[in-house]
């Protein structure tokens, strides 16, 4: 169900939802469930799941040299969304970023949302990378959240409930 439908169906009643951050690589999803379980008593109609921008890390190559490598420290947004939707029977809202994604990668993510029956996304420009003074869009990606919303709309013909935040 779309977030807008949840709000309409509430008929003025207060709704509680929350936003979660995917665990770091190597952590168990069970830790995430352990944090979500006590919050389910509030009956959230939907749960937002953030997407972390990629970042540079330095990896020791073993010969005293460091290699600069681009990585995501908290991957798995869509997998977590699908898992929460299945385990708790609650709608999920993955964050979709301009930063770190080409338009083609965004399209693939939206196709995955469709296959997973995820009807909502939150479109965000995203933050600048840690070593950038200001936001620099990914080559071949969207510069503004409004551009991202336009892409989502065009690809899905308004199938998704898109919340805009820049």
Question: Which stretches of residues belong to each language-model region?
Answer:
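Acidic (Asp/Glu)-rich catalytic clusters
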Residues: 8-11, 36-43, 79-89, 110-118
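Conserved, mostly hydrophobic/aromatic
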Residues: 19, 47, 113
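Glycine-rich, proline-tolerant flexible connector loops at the mouths of alpha/beta enzymes
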Residues: 23, 42-77, 129-140
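Phosphate/pyrophosphate-binding betaalpha-module
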Residues: 132, 136-160
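Glycine-rich anion/phosphate-binding loops
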Residues: 27-33, 98-115
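N-terminal amphipathic alpha-helix/helix-capping segment at the start of soluble metabolic enzymes
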Residues: 1-18
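Conserved small/polar residues in nucleotide/adenosyl-binding loops
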Residues: 160-166
């Amino acid at each position: 169900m779309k977030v807008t439908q949840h709000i309409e169906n509430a008929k003025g009643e207060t709704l509680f939802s929350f936003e979660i951050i995917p665990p770091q690589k190597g952590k168990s999803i069970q830790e995430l469930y352990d944090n979500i379980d006590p919050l389910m008593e509030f009956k959230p109609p939907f749960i937002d799941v953030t997407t972390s921008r990629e970042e540079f890390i330095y990896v020791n190559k073993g010969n005293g040299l460091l290699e600069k490598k681009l990585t995501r420290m908290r991957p798995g947004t869509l997998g977590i969304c699908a898992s929460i939707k299945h385990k708790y029977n609650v709608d999920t809202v993955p964050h979709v970023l301009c930063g770190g994604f080409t338009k083609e990668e965004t399209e693939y993510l939206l196709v995955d949302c469709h296959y997973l029956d995820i009807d909502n996304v939150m479109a965000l420009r995203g933050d600048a990378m840690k070593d950038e003074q200001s936001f620099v869009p990914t080559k071949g990606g969207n510069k503004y959240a409004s551009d991202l919303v336009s892409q989502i709309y065009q690809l899905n013909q308004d199938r998704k409930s898109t919340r805009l935040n820049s």
